Amino acid sequence: MDATQPQYELSVVTQCLKSAIDVIQWLIPTITKFSQSHPLVFQLLFIFFTFYVFYKLLMNFITLVKRFLYLTLVVTCIGIYMRGSQQFLTVDLLNFYNFVMSNRYYAFKIYTLFINALEREINTVYHLAQMKMEQLLK
């Protein structure tokens, strides 16, 4: 057992990130060699890949917005059906708006808790990557 290397119980996220680092360490020199030997093909592939990723992200975002609007429409229809249009539009929407405005920092609190939990994982991966770099430089 190596005394200099601390033993970590690696979670699934840490294992995935470690594997991703290994793949990236192999990919960077390969891509560099390919881009030096075939610059035009590399540029065309990079542009195509960039547009493809942008297109997929845009389509996923549009799908997400459409699903949110459908859900909002369904909830609104159910609310109007159950409470009546006058009650729903004048009282319920106002109460919902006041509730959202009073708890607007709730999502930020959840986000902060998530970031704090993720920071421990990132520190573990950073330490492992730093040790691997030190081993490679020796």
Swiss-Prot record:
The keyword Lipid metabolism does not apply. One of its GO terms (cellular component) is nuclear envelope. Keywords: Endoplasmic reticulum, Membrane, mRNA transport, Nucleus, Transmembrane, Transmembrane helix, Transport. Its main location: nucleus. The chain crosses the membrane at residues 40-58, 68-84. It is a multi-pass membrane protein. Residues 1-39, 85-138 are cytoplasmic. It comes from the Eukaryota. Residues 59-67 are perinuclear space. One of its GO terms (biological process) is mRNA transport. InterPro entries: APQ12. The keyword Transmembrane applies. It is found in: Nucleus membrane; Endoplasmic reticulum membrane. Involved in the regulation of lipid homeostasis in the endoplasmic reticulum, thereby impacting nuclear pore complex biogenesis and localization, and nucleocytoplasmic mRNA transport. Belongs to the APQ12 family. This is Nuclear membrane organization protein APQ12.
